[in-house]
């Protein structure tokens, strides 16, 4: 009986360790690549003591934790690199946890905004994907707690 319980526990642990691609894994994997530019910004970069803010603006800033930016630079000698990388990011964003908020542009040129959260007023993460085949693309992750898009706009 103890062996069966141990076996079931191990199976549950292995099953819960999903190995599906995520934006976080993609970001970590490509941070050191020479084809990418990576930047992390903390909420402390915004000095609120020198500006006057409304209560709504204060609430928006308090819900913001950090921002991760990952940009892919298109190389004229390697056009297929753009197609491969943008396809990988778009595949990650097709996961059901990412909900599209809006989209602009057409084809490979344009931008889209996604969010992760229980509903559209309690958002944990915003993701902006913008790109142009000739220049490259950028993925911007804005992480926070209970972010509300009406406070940001």
Language-model segments: which ranges?
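Function-determining sites in protein domains
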Residues: 76-79, 83-110
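Positively charged n-region of N-terminal signal peptides that target proteins for export
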Residues: 1-4
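Extracytoplasmic electrostatic interaction patches
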Residues: 105-153
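Sec-dependent N-terminal signal peptides
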Residues: 6-8
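C-terminal motif of bacterial Sec signal peptides marking the signal peptidase cleavage site
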Residues: 13-16
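Alpha-helix initiation and N-capping motif
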Residues: 20, 86, 149-152
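Early exported N-terminus immediately downstream of N-terminal targeting peptides
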Residues: 23-89
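Contiguous interface-forming segments/domains that mediate binding rather than catalysis
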Residues: 18-28, 94-97, 105-107, 136
């Amino acid at each position: 009986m103890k062996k069966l319980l141990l076996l079931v526990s191990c199976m549950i642990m292995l099953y819960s360790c999903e190995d599906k691609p995520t934006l976080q894994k993609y970001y970590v994997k490509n941070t050191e690549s020479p084809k990418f530019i990576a930047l992390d910004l903390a909420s402390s970069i915004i000095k609120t003591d020198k500006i006057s803010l409304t209560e709504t603006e204060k609430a928006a800033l308090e819900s913001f934790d950090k921002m991760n930016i990952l940009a892919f630079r298109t190389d004229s000698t390697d056009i297929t690199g753009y197609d491969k990388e943008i396809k990988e990011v778009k595949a990650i964003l097709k996961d059901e946890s990412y909900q599209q908020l809006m989209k602009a542009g057409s084809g490979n040129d344009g931008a889209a905004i996604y969010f992760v959260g229980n509903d559209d007023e309690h958002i944990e993460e915003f993701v902006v994907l913008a790109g142009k085949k000739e220049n490259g693309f950028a993925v911007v992750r804005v992480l926070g707690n209970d972010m509300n898009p009406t406070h940001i706009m």
